Amino acid sequence: MMKYRYTYYVLLCLTLVGLASCEMKDELLGKGEQGGSGEVGVLDLKLKVVPPSYGNGGVSSKSSSTELIVPKAEDMIVKVFNASMELQDYFESYADYLKESQYVLEQGTYYIEAYSGDNYEVTSEYPYYELLDTCVIKAKEVTLVDKACELQSAILYLTLSEEFLNACKDDYAITITNGSGVLSVGKGDARIVYIRPGMKTTVTIRATEKITGKPVIWTFGLADSEGKINSQDLFRIEIKDLE
């Protein structure tokens, strides 16, 4: 008698599992509460982060004061907006999105935004990476979006020559401002600065000559031929002297 009860219990469990699987499938295919209309599909978002490449003489992408900071793809914030630009879903990180076994959406047009955090005006710590894309979800289909977050900041790469370091005291300060934000760089600070694109950025160097004790100031601007700064612009500045 116990044998038959055990067999019945196993069959009942298998039946329940099968029903659950069917319900999940019906949800994806638009059945059940959707009334068989087939109105939903799946968004399969494949996200990566691609740093800029400047070739020889550019900057590398590791993690010291003279190398690019590159965020991890799993740390990107992800937002999904519907066709009316209303926020559909918000994920604190791409890693949270990946926890979804299947990300189901009603059919229609969606806008995807993935980004690394705040878009600072001037910073040495938080380069701004971003992805903006549009996709169309079709009923009963999986829509693949395989895209890369790319750097949206401009880069200022500062190098101090031996000539400058020998001539000036260690109390020098380099101030970078784009009119909205400002950053001061001193001895031991990062030599790569990330700037939000926009109008011309001004760099001011203040130092003291070792021999004379005379304060010196040097100011110059960063911009393209149109007086602007664009995403991924690279400004390599070697400071040799202040004459």
Which functions belong to the PLM regions below?
Residues 22-190, 197-243:
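Sec-type signal peptide cleavage vicinity
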Residues 1-23:
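Sec-dependent bacterial lipoprotein signal peptides
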